[in-house]
Amino acid sequence: MTYRPATDGPDLASLTLGVEEEFLLLDAETGESMPVAARVLDGLSGVAHAQSRREFRHSMVEMVTPVLSDLAELRRHLVALRTAAADAAEAAGARLVAVGATPVNETHRTVPDEPRYHAMSRRFGPVAHDPAVCGCHVHVGLPDRELAVQVCNHLRPWLPVVQAITANSPLHDGQDTGHASWRAMQLERWPSIGPTPYFDSAADYDATVADLIKAGIMLDAGMVYWYVRPSAAYPTVEIRVGDVCPTVDDTVLVAGLVRALVATVAADVHDGARAPRIRGCLLSAAHWRAAHDGLDGDLVDLRTGRARPAWDLVDDLFALVTPALERQGDRAYVRDQLARVRAEGTGAVRQRRILDRSACDVRAVLDHLAAQTRPAPV
């Protein structure tokens, strides 16, 4: 289907954005999960309380920014929300930790006492009780739902690159898994998580979701956990592929790249460009490679189907979105933050560096993660 806009289209230079960050609540000594989410949420006040959410574990919280227009504003909100949540966690005897997967054994795996969570637990059994995982979800405003579905199609070739940039979960049960994002591996056990299928239209998308619900694969449309989707709750495209980022600047970098990428491909859709129909097996393999290697090895260039050095594809992505970044005033910030990640490594690389330096002391990694999670005082 060729997208035919009803209007001149959205102002692609000023797309709004918002970010959801999920965090673990861990014991400072053992690193084990602590089921104190209710106390942490009760300890928040004002804007932070209004922007907090209960999650799928008693040992998790989610902080959600409001709808925003620029990256500087986003950074200020993320700093404030992380600081408030870290303070509330400490008051509850825990530490707020931004990491994609539970790094040590999780003993508390019960879901909160909410009907929907209990229904998921009954339907999916042990999968619903896997160790907790945390993601970073970026929303970009696109009120035209038909356009949003086509944008999802166009984003698919680039999402493994975004996934690799965010990789921040190499540890599981106190051991290095050999994967940069163990979260991605763990989530594959759910039937409605993974690369987003190609859809011809919004009607095609809705019919597919309805069929999956009727087939018992999902409880409701809220269980569409594909890596990118038209949001079920907001007039946005929601990119869900990434691990939660270790630092505020890592999160803002990803949000800036994603918004510019959405603006770039939305312009292509508006001009009549068709998204490539990538074979599902190749798309899944590209995401596996991103989760395994992060930015330390090769990624699959889905434009050619061949492996290329990961940073070459990051450079290609940056070049692709540079015009959008310039229109949004974000080019210098994103360029500088990519240079920092190139020098320091992804969150997974940073964790492994601490693990090597500390003779495999996982507590040293947890100290590092907690320090990275809490923004430095201004």
From Swiss-Prot:
UniProt keywords, alphabetically: ATP-binding, Ligase, Nucleotide-binding
Is Membrane a UniProt keyword of this protein? no
Domain of life of the source: Bacteria
GO terms (molecular function) for this protein are:
ATP binding; glutamate-cysteine ligase activity
* SUPFAM superfamilies, per database record: Glutamine synthetase/guanido kinase
Annotated catalysed reactions: L-cysteine + L-glutamate + ATP = gamma-L-glutamyl-L-cysteine + ADP + phosphate + H(+)
Q: Which InterPro entries match?
A: GCL_type2/YbdK_subfam, GCS2, Gln_synth/guanido_kin_cat_dom, YbdK
One BP term from GO: modified amino acid biosynthetic process
The record's Pfam families line, in alphabetical order, gives: GCS2
- NCBIfam families from the entry? gshA_cyan_rel, PRK13517.1-1
Q: What is this protein called?
A: Putative glutamate--cysteine ligase 2
Q: Which organism is it from?
A: Salinispora arenicola (strain CNS-205)
